[in-house]
């Protein structure tokens, strides 16, 4: 597999002024939620020495990182996140506010040299308890003795169980407050208890992967993935139905949008595609996809991080395939799929096809018909349908 292209330097964004605590900040206007409730909660509770070294896990659009970096004017801040699109926004926010003591990392785990080097870890709850546990383990490894963990998140997204996990890992946890339906707590890295059993779980323990097998059309593929990736430990039923009915033209140029751990792109490469591009906004998904392509000896594929087709702008394809997300947080939404469809139509070569799988209750046929000449239902079952559209 070829390495993906270097991360592009973004154009100067349009900016909006927002308030966080007692400070005014500039953030990209494109940020859907420039200041989250957890940002306000953490900004009011995190105490730092001016020379502190701070690790931020899950910084959103970067407003919190700006405020914390200002507080540690003689120190350093490292920002990590699972989403490349959030890190893009955070980089723009840091630049827009003239922050020079903060670094954005696109690695999925801390480097060995960063262990036991931070005075504080500030963590906003990610999606999924197992990814949260992985981040707690990262924070525990990163903190020096007596370093502090600050953890916050929404009640309805599972912050209370994760605060319990922090207690199992660090020892006693101190609640710091509740506001805007979010909780915040603090833990100190002192004499650590015996690690809980989940601390050694594959994929949860930093540096490890969750291994599993996926059977498609009589072929068994060994795969690896990580918590935070959709259906990270199995072949989901929608993708299975899609692959059972997906035909790859020999020599085709194929794009897999929202690739997850890369199975669709891997299948296309094994089935005769000349070139396969895969995109996902998740750094965890992209890392898993690269790992699976490499493990299966695929050399005609390239994995990109970014939103939808933005990382492959200007490229054209014979076949574009996707199993699009239909949740944003706890809400059901087709916004991502609509964006995928619009962008895919513009990237298809004459005679090209766009194939997607979706829940049957999502009427994507109505979105596809005005854009494509032919829309055909290839397959369906009780939960999913596979739709093919041709130029």
Residue ranges with predicted function:
Residues 119-130, 257-264, 317-330:
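Conserved proline-anchored active-site loop of SAM-dependent methyltransferases
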Residues 34-112, 237-322:
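Conserved SAM/SAH cofactor-binding pocket of Class I
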Residues 68, 139-140, 166, 268, ...:
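Class I S-adenosylmethionine-dependent transferase superfamily signal
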Residues 10, 16-49, 180-251:
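SAM-dependent Rossmann-like transferase core, predominantly class I methyltransferases
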Residues 133-145, 338-350:
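A short glycine-rich, Lys/Arg-flanked "PGG" loop and its adjoining helix->strand segment in the class I
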Residues 171-210, 359-391:
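Class I S-adenosyl-L-methionine
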Residues 79, 151, 278, 356, ...:
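Conserved SAM-binding loop
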Residues 146-154, 351-358:
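Conserved beta-strand signature within the Rossmann-like core of class I S-adenosyl-L-methionine
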């Amino acid at each position: 597999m070829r390495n993906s292209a270097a991360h592009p330097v973004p154009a100067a964004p349009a900016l909006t002024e927002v308030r966080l605590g007692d400070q005014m900040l500039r953030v990209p206007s494109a940020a859907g939620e420039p200041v989250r409730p957890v940002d306000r909660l953490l900004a009011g509770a995190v105490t730092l020495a001016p020379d502190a070294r701070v690790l931020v896990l899950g910084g959103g659009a970067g407003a919190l990182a700006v405020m914390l970096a200002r507080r540690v004017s003689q120190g350093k801040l490292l920002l990590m996140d699972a989403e490349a699109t959030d890190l893009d926004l955070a980089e723009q926010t840091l630049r827009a506010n003239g922050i020079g003591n903060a670094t954005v990392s696109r690695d999925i785990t801390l480097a060995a040299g960063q262990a036991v080097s931070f005075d504080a870890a500030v963590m906003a709850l990610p999606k999924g308890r197992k990814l949260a546990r992985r981040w707690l383990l990262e924070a525990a490894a990163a903190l020096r003795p007596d370093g502090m963990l600050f953890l916050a998140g929404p009640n309805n997204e599972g912050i209370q169980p994760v605060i319990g996990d922090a207690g199992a890992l660090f020892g006693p946890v101190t609640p710091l407050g509740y506001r805007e339906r979010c909780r915040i707590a603090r833990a100190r890295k002192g004499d650590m208890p015996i690690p809980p059993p989940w601390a050694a779980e594959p994929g949860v323990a930093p540096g490890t992967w969750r291994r599993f097998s996926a059977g498609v059309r009589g072929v068994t593929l060994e795969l690896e993935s990580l918590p935070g990736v959709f259906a990270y430990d199995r072949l989901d039923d929608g993708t299975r139905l899609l692959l059972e009915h997906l035909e790859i033209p020999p020599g085709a140029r194929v794009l897999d949008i929202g690739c997850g751990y890369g199975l669709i792109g891997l299948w296309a490469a094994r089935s005769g595609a000349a070139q396969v591009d895969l995109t996902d906004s998740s750094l965890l998904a992209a890392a898993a996809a690269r790992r699976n392509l490499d493990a299966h000896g695929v050399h005609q594929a390239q994995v990109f991080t970014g939103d939808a087709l933005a990382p492959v702008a200007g490229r054209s394809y014979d076949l574009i395939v996707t199993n699009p997300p239909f949740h944003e947080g706890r809400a059901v939404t087709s916004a991502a799929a609509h964006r995928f469809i619009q962008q895919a139509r513009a990237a298809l070569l004459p005679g090209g096809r766009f194939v997607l799988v979706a829940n049957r209750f999502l009427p994507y046929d109505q979105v596809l018909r005005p854009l494509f000449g032919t829309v055909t239902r290839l397959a369906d079952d009780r939960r999913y349908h596979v739709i093919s559209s041709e130029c």
